Amino acid sequence: MLGLLLFIIGGIADSIFTVNPVVVTATRTPKALKDVPVVTRVIGLDDIRRTDATNIQDLLTTELPGLEFGYAMSREPALNMGGFGGNAILFLVDGERLAGETMDNVDYSRLNLDNVGRVEIVKGAASALYGANAVGGVVNLISREDTAPWTLNVNSRYSSAGDGWRNGVRFSFKSGRWRSQTAFQQSRVSTIRLADAFDTQSDLQTVWGGSVVSVKERLIYNPIENLKLIARGSFFKRHSNRTTYTDHYDDYSTGLRGVYDFGIGRNLEISYSFDRYDKSRYVLGQLTNSHDYSNRQHVVHSLFNLPVGKWQLTFGADYMNDFLSTYQFTDNQGKRQYSADAYAQFDINLLPWLNIVGSLRHDYFSASKSNATTARLAAMLKWSGFSVRSSYAGGFRAPTLKELYMDFDMVGMMMIYGNPDLKAERSNNYNLAFEHYGNIRGCFDGSYSITLMGYCNKYDKRITTTDVSVDSEHEMGLLYCNEDGVTVSGVEFNGKIRTQLGLSAAVSYNYLCASGNSMQSQFSQPRRHSMTCHIDYDKQIFKNYSISASVSCRYMSKSRDAAAPDKAYSIWKATLNQRLVKAYSLTFVIDNLFNYKPKVFYLNTPTTIGTNFSVGLSVDIDSLSF
C-alpha cells in the first residue's frame, strides 16, 4: 500500500540512490547490504547520532521492535530479543566475543558507542558461522574508520534522569603507514527511586546509580601494501552503588589481528584476543572477597577467503581457552574448558538474479564433551525493485561452566546446583523476507524501501532449572537441567522513506508469538506487539548553520507474563540537534514526552518516573579555524 501511494505521488524510478553500506556480519565477508541473502539490519553513524544513545542498550531499545531490556534478580540489565534471553544472543565488537556475564547477559555498559561507526544485527540462528550463543541472533559493533589526517572531538552530555553526566574525548590520526584511534568516556548517574520501599506490588524499587570509565585504543599499521596489522586494547571500570555495598566490575582486553590481501578476493586473516572480566564487592571501602568473580578468555582465530570461478569460498577455525573462577563454585575454585571449531562457506551467484550461500560448522567443548554440527543455507532472488530472501539456519549453545559446576547457597534461601550431564541447546530457524524499494520523482524526490519478514525458531533442549528435593547429595534448591523447548514465530515489517527536502521517516513493527515452556530460564513471555517509528528533518539553513530534528516513538503491548503483567505503553522522544560552523554540535532532548509513569514496576517495566531532559555539546577541534 505504501509503495502504491508513493507511485501515485511521483512515479518510481528504476534505480535507487540511497546509501548501500557494505556489511560483514551475515557472511563474514564484505558484501553490499542489498546483496546479502540473510536479513541484516544496519544502524549507521547518523542513526546513532540521531538517537543520542549512550550505549548499545539505549540504541537497540530506540531502533528495534521485538526487543526489550528488563532487569535480572541481580538488578542488572537483562535482554529479551525475539523471545530469546541475553545468553542466546551473541554480542561482538569488530567480530570478537566478550568475556564475563551478569546473570546470563553481557555487561551492556561495556558496549558504549564512542568509537562505533555502525551496528549490524542478524536476527535468527547464526551458529554455522559464529558457534555457541548465536542461537537467537548476532549483534556486531563495528568501529568507525576515520580518513582525515587527524580528528579530535570532545563532548559532554547532561541528563535530568539521575543527574547523569557523560563526558568523552575521541582522537584519531593518519600518517604514512600508521593510523590510530583513541577513545575515552566517563559517565556517572545517581540512584533513581522508582517506587516506595514499602511498595509490595513492585519488584523494582530503585535503579542503582554508579560510574563508568572506559578507554579504548585501536592502532593500524601497514608494513607493506598488502598486509594490515591491527592492535587494540581497552580498559573498563564500573561501580554500582548499592545501599550497603558497592559492586566493582573491571575488564581488560587486548588483541592483535593480521590481514594479508593476495588480491582478487583472496585474503588471509589471523588474530589473537584476550579478555578478562572481573567482579568484586566492597563494604565501607573494604574488599569482602564474598563475590569474587573472574572470567578470562584466550581466542585464536583464522579466516581464509578464496574465489574459484563463480564461487567465493570461506574457511575458518577458532580455538578458545575459557577460565572461570567465581563465588558460585565450591570454595571459589576455578574451572577451565577449551573449545575448537572449523567451518566452511560457499557463496555463488548462479544467475544474475540468484545468489546462494551455504555454511557448515563443527564445534567441540571439552567441559561438557559437547559436539555440535550446524548448517545454514540462504538464497536470494532479486529483480528490478524487488528481492526475496529465504534461509534455514541451525543454532546451538553449549552449557557454560557456571551451568555445569555451580554450587551456590543463595543467601540461605536455597541451593543452586550445576549439572555436568547437561546437553547443548539446539535451534532451527526459518526466515522468509520480501523487499521492495525504489525512487520517488516529483514534489517528493527521494527513495523508499519496504520489507516484510516471517520467521520461525524452534528451540530444543534448552537449559533451565528444576526443583530438587533433599537427598544424600543435595539440599533443597534448584538444579540445572534440559527440558522441552519453545517455538518462537512472528512477522516483522519495516518501512523507510527519505526525501531530498530533508524529510525522512521509518516505522518497524513486530508481531511475536511464543509457545512452550517460555516462562522459565532465559525466556519470559514476550510482548506480542511492538513498534518503533521516527520522523526526521535535516536541513542546511545557512552556510555555517544546520539543524536536525527527530520525533520517535516506542510502543509495547501488554505483557503476557502472569508474574509481571505490565500494561501496554508508548514512550515518545523529541530531539533537536544544531550544527554551527561545522565544529559545534548542540543537542536538546525531551525523553518520555507525554510523561508516562508506570503504576507498578515489574522487572520488565520501563524504568521511567516521567519526562526528563538532556542537553549535550560536541566540539570537533579539528574543524575549528585557528
What are these regions (language model features)?
Residues 20-49, 78:
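N-terminal periplasmic "start-of-domain" segments of outer-membrane beta-barrel proteins
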Residues 22, 558, 566, 576-626:
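C-terminal beta-signal and adjacent terminal beta-strands/loops
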Residues 57-96:
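Extracytoplasmic beta-strand/coil segments of soluble accessory domains associated
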Residues 96-123:
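Short acidic/polar hinge/loop motifs at secondary-structure boundaries
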Residues 140, 148-152, 157, 170-249:
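Periplasmic-side early beta-strands and strand-to-turn transitions of outer-membrane beta-barrels
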Residues 181, 216, 220-238, 248-372, ...:
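Face-selective signature of the C-terminal outer-membrane beta-barrel domain
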Residues 269-283, 382, 389, 423-481, ...:
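Membrane-embedded beta-barrel scaffold of Gram-negative outer-membrane proteins
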Residues 349-356, 449-459, 479-559:
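Gram-negative outer-membrane beta-barrel transporters
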